[in-house]
């Protein structure tokens, strides 16, 4: 039987169905790292960015053997992608559900995403100027307004779409790569502090263990 711990982010309340389990309030990476060492299953009570932060710490610690249950208060982009419930149903399933390995999408910095990443124009720029590919398919070459990247539950693991007035069709693949004059990288709603000329999101060789 896996030992189960609860990671609660911010001032969120612990769902009643998780009562009796050890609870850790997480304010930063150090709090996540502390919990990783103690449990075989972690229940994340938070938002997509916080679930991604937990997966990032597991990835960097080489602890993708830890099962992860997601119990956000309400539905999110990640719950739709990975087809898991939210609220009370999610909390109940966190204790009783079985884990299965699903695709893990990360970037070159070792940061995971679970809902959506985006490439947006860099500082003082109106458009992205560059070129992006998904596997062997050219996503764009020239100027675009924005690019969004999402994990997919099915292989090959991710999909990307370009905005140029309207959002174009999705292109699926294992990796999305960009070379540009400068973009702002956004991961699950959190913008990087500095602009980047290159960025890559790709399917990690090993997935993460999602409790479903």
Identify the role of each PLM range.
Residues 179-212:
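Extended, charged low-complexity segments
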């Amino acid at each position: 039987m896996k030992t189960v711990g609860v990671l609660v982010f911010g001032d969120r309340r612990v769902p009643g169905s998780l009562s009796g389990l050890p609870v850790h309030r997480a304010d930063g990476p150090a709090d996540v790292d502390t919990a990783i060492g103690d449990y075989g299953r972690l229940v994340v009570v938070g938002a997509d960015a916080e679930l991604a932060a937990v997966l990032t710490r597991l990835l960097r610690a080489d602890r993708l053997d830890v099962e992860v249950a997601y119990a956000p208060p309400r539905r999110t982009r990640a719950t739709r992608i990975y087809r898991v419930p939210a609220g009370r149903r999610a909390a109940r399933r966190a204790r009783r559900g079985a884990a299965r390995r699903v695709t893990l999408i990360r970037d070159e910095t070792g940061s995971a995403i679970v809902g959506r990443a985006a490439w947006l124009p860099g500082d003082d720029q109106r458009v992205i100027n560059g070129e992006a590919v998904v596997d062997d398919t050219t996503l764009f070459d020239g100027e675009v307004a924005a690019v969004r990247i999402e994990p997919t539950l099915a292989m090959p693991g991710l999909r990307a779409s370009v905005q140029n007035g309207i959002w174009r069709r999705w292109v699926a693949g294992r990796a999305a790569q960009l070379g540009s004059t400068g973009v702002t990288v956004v991961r699950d709603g959190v913008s990087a502090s500095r602009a980047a000329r290159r960025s890559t999101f790709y399917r990690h060789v090993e997935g993460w263990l999602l409790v479903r």
